[in-house]
Amino acid sequence: MADDNLLTTLDTYLASGIHIGTQQKTEDMKRFIYRVRADGLYVLDVRKTDERIGLAAKFLSKYEPEEILAVSRRIYSVGPLKKFGQTTGITTAAGRFVPGTLTNPSSRKFLEPEVLFLSDPRIDRQALKEAIEIGIPIVGMCDTEHLTSFIDFIIPTNNKGRKSVSLVYYLIAREYMKNRGLIGEDVPFTYEEFLEKAMSVKVKVKPQQFQRGRRWGKRR
């Protein structure tokens, strides 16, 4: 059960390391930072992260699953990202983002999403660049060192840890489906299932593995 109106328990957030940033910060991310530790690591404000996850899910829930493209090139995000796509029906692209995916209609992998959800604005810079070019909104997981000029909706989080990334994907999947009336309080999937996918990654990711989105029934 969540506490103090959080999406999950504070203990779950802290155990995932979702609040652990880097030893660098930008002015863009300063408003989400709670403190700096003695070892120089910046710590994110968990309650602000929780709030932004909820708001991001609410924003994404305005779109059909096939209108959203979720991408990640970071290897430990691939498993949770695929689980995210399987759970929600949202289109996902894991691994290297092939140039022209959003801008070249002649490409076999050409997609026309209405919104982009990325796991790291630096690692996923090709997808970010193309989303900017075609003018669609961008939701992004951002750590303390990121520049966020082109991110329309920031989710402040540790986007490098397996546990933290798995938790973000799980919570957004859950809240997205709740907001669209597809599930109720009895959630048919767990954070542990997302985390298991992250922990099982041992091999190099193949270039751009797609999962096409699917349309669910009408929202309630």
UniProtKB/Swiss-Prot annotation:
One of its GO terms (molecular function) is structural constituent of ribosome. One of its GO terms (cellular component) is small ribosomal subunit. Gene3D superfamilies: Glucose-6-phosphate isomerase like protein, domain 1. Keywords: Ribonucleoprotein, Ribosomal protein. InterPro entries: Ribosomal_uS2 (IPR001865), Ribosomal_uS2_arc (IPR023454), Ribosomal_uS2_CS (IPR018130), Ribosomal_uS2_euk/arc (IPR005707), Ribosomal_uS2_flav_dom_sf (IPR023591). PROSITE patterns: RIBOSOMAL_S2_2. GO terms for biological process: translation. PANTHER family: 40S RIBOSOMAL PROTEIN SA (PTHR11489). Belongs to the universal ribosomal protein uS2 family. This is Small ribosomal subunit protein uS2.
